[in-house]
């Protein structure tokens, strides 16, 4: 007899884990099916930023609603450790985007976020040794920082399993099963599983699974590369997480010895999500060094420690799809486009409300529909920065 549940979640990254937690705590029978291992996909390669600065208010609200989970993990989740480190966060923009940043920061302040616009001199104080002449303005969030993405996913799942959720790793779902106009479960390489509700949280593979129920999702696999560099001696001082629009990169401290660095440009979009994750090309590493040294000249004597590539699903507007679509009981939660970690706690809560109550009450996710792409209504902030990490 096939194993059954009230809800099957396909994917055990941080989004699937958060949803499992929120459903299980409400007494729902949850089965999580993961093709590889917990956090083995985009989550395990995430840089773990915890920040609220977005140019789209609904996205900022999701990040703001998620923040208390990271800050108060033991009280809110009570299992595992998300590893949150409060470093502060800086959003750096060139002169041409300074006014947009001021308006977006005012929007965040209206939501209740502790954040201010600061100038180059304050950036130089917060990031010792930084070149600041090209900075038009910066937004500073003193309470933000970074967390451990894998630890966050494992913690959510530990809490979900404490409340009765089940997890199968190494279980590759091949199709969503449908009878008439209703979902009945899934087919996998470990057999069939039954449920009246299936949530596709399969990251870069989400589009393939949606296609098995006739739902076409504009989702492309997107590779993102990150590297850890050793800091030179004498440069172990703390500094904030930084999104640097001028140099199209981001970086953050890892303890007092390392810097994690990623680039926005030059990443591969398209192809098969099953392609092997090859090592970073030497040209990519050299470009990383060039850009970080342009902002932090003292990194010229830094040393590469390790580097890796990961992948996520990218939508045309680089924002997720969160809704019921296609046959009754089929839900999409995909297309996070590399920025889903920091919003995962609130999105899990919203999806649980949508599934169980038919509507969301904590935050409004009604704009995150699949139909927006067909209608040409891409989600874009009123004052966008015009690049991937927004």
Residue ranges of model-derived segments:
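C-terminal catalytic lobe of FAD-dependent flavoproteins
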Residues: 290-390
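Helical element adjacent to the flavin cofactor pocket in flavoenzyme catalytic cores
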Residues: 140-194
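Central helical "cap/lid" subdomain
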Residues: 192-240
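Dinucleotide-binding Rossmann-like beta1-alpha1 core, especially the glycine-rich loop
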Residues: 48-126, 248-250
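Active-site lid/adjacent beta-loop-alpha segment flanking the redox-cofactor pocket in flavoenzymes
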Residues: 216, 231-329
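Beta1/beta-strand and adjacent pyrophosphate-binding region of the FAD-binding site
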Residues: 2-13, 31
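Glycine-rich FAD pyrophosphate-binding loop
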Residues: 24-43
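Short beta-strand to alpha-helix junction loop
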Residues: 61, 91-100, 140-158, 277-284
